[in-house]
Amino acid sequence: MGKNVVVLGTQWGDEGKGKIVDLLTEHAAAVVRYQGGHNAGHTLVIDGEKTVLHLIPSGVLREGVQCLIGNGVVVAPDALLREITKLEEKGVPVRERLRISPSCPLILSFHVALDQAREKARGELKIGTTGRGIGPAYEDKVARRGLRVGDLLNMPRFEDKLRELVDYHNFMLVGYYKEPAIEFEKTLAECKEYAELLKPLMLDVTAELHDLRRAGKDIMFEGAQGSLLDIDHGTYPYVTSSNTTAGGVATGSGVGPMFLDYILGITKAYTTRVGSGPFPTELFDEVGAHLAKQGHEFGATTGRARRCGWFDAVILRRAIDVNSISGICFTKLDVLDGLETINICVGYKDADGNDVAPTDADSYVGLQPVYEEVPGWTESTVGAKTLEELPANARAYIKRVEALIGAPIDIISTGPDRNETIVLRHPFA
């Protein structure tokens, strides 16, 4: 029988999921996206060549791997088609292997306009969204007024529903936010073009996944963003609009939790965050600048600089519990090379010195991290392929993190290329 493996982020996103998905797809018949949209930015480096993917699953660069976009993903047709074109220009036969669930909600121009108008209106209180229409598209889905990919197949009905949606959202755009109205005819013309291009890619993804499962094929489920951005379990309201935790796999693909065999949590050896929201271990000194520079910490989707800080074992333990993590992949260990000492957050205290376990953004206010200091290392870890090649202090750091989080570190990434990896236990084994 084949195995179903989930790869997801355990922090605030940007943990290095794309590289690991690409590495593990050597064993997979299919890779599935199950939540989020083109707000994701998954960077792959193969033989020194960098590719950034936003909507298309990271298995696309592996010959013969089927790439599926499940019903939980919100699809911006213009962004998807641009991504397909870029890959085809590199010689990747995307349309042969990419299939999209007709149940995926569509992101259209008014969703983007609303997203950006809201962030503009919030001013300094903005959440820090990518401004790509993700949240408004999920809102339409939950309110049962949204248009889906499959609606493009019935254009007369689509036109009626689109007119209602444009009128509905223009009421807010013009009347409340004082922004320009979205043109119905222009939007309709764009959608007619999308319909012709997307029709050959539509497939009942849930049925396909169960066919693959029954045939004994290995399947990988690729998460976007990170567990602490989950709409339910993240640092609300500074979160994304989908379930980034393992529960989102079942709802976003139609494959139930009993069929998930291994959940791999991708975890940076330090911590980063993009945009607003609590970040207890954030560094504002030269160490923070070192992490940002060595880790090239700029968002693959937005280009925004990421906030950097020490590794936080408290938030990791929460992510491990919420996701039922089987094993951890520790990424960007090489970024810590050259640091004399390294801090690990092992708890938080409030103003009165009490131990606190925060559950939402407000409960982080005024908390101070409690650190355990461990020795760093001066030797390079870049490109190490066995545990024995790592400096003794790097191995000790990994062991200490394992003990603090209560989960095994099964994979260690020592560089951006797919071959710069130490695999201690393979998820598909």
From Swiss-Prot:
> Which residues carry out catalysis?
D14, H42
Entries under CDD domains matching the protein: AdSS
Root EC class: ligase
Write out the GO biological process terms: 'de novo' AMP biosynthetic process; IMP metabolic process
Where on this chain does IMP bind? D14, E15, G16, K17, N39, A40, G41, H42, T130, R144, Q225, T240, R304
Give binding positions for GTP: 13-19, 41-43, 306, 332-334, 413-415
Cite the Pfam families for this sequence.
Adenylsucc_synt
The main location is: cytoplasm
Q: What is its EC number?
A: 6.3.4.4
Cofactor annotation comment: Binds 1 Mg(2+) ion per subunit.
Task: Enumerate the GO terms in the molecular function aspect.
Answer: adenylosuccinate synthase activity; GTP binding; magnesium ion binding
Q: What's the catalysed reaction?
A: IMP + L-aspartate + GTP = N(6)-(1,2-dicarboxyethyl)-AMP + GDP + phosphate + 2 H(+)
Cofactor(s) listed in the protein's UniProt record: Mg(2+)
What are the binding positions for Mg(2+) in this chain?
A: D14, G41
Positions with a binding annotation for substrate: A300, T301, T302, G303, R304, A305, R306
* Keyword tags: Cytoplasm, GTP-binding, Ligase, Magnesium, Metal-binding, Nucleotide-binding, Purine biosynthesis
| One GO cellular component term | cytoplasm
Q: In which pathway does it act?
A: Purine metabolism; AMP biosynthesis via de novo pathway; AMP from IMP: step 1/2
Localization per record: Cytoplasm
- Give the protein family: Belongs to the adenylosuccinate synthetase family.
Q: What does this protein do?
A: Plays an important role in the de novo pathway of purine nucleotide biosynthesis. Catalyzes the first committed step in the biosynthesis of AMP from IMP.
Q: How does it assemble?
A: Homodimer.
Q: Which NCBIfam families match?
A: PRK01117.1, purA
What's this protein's name? Adenylosuccinate synthetase
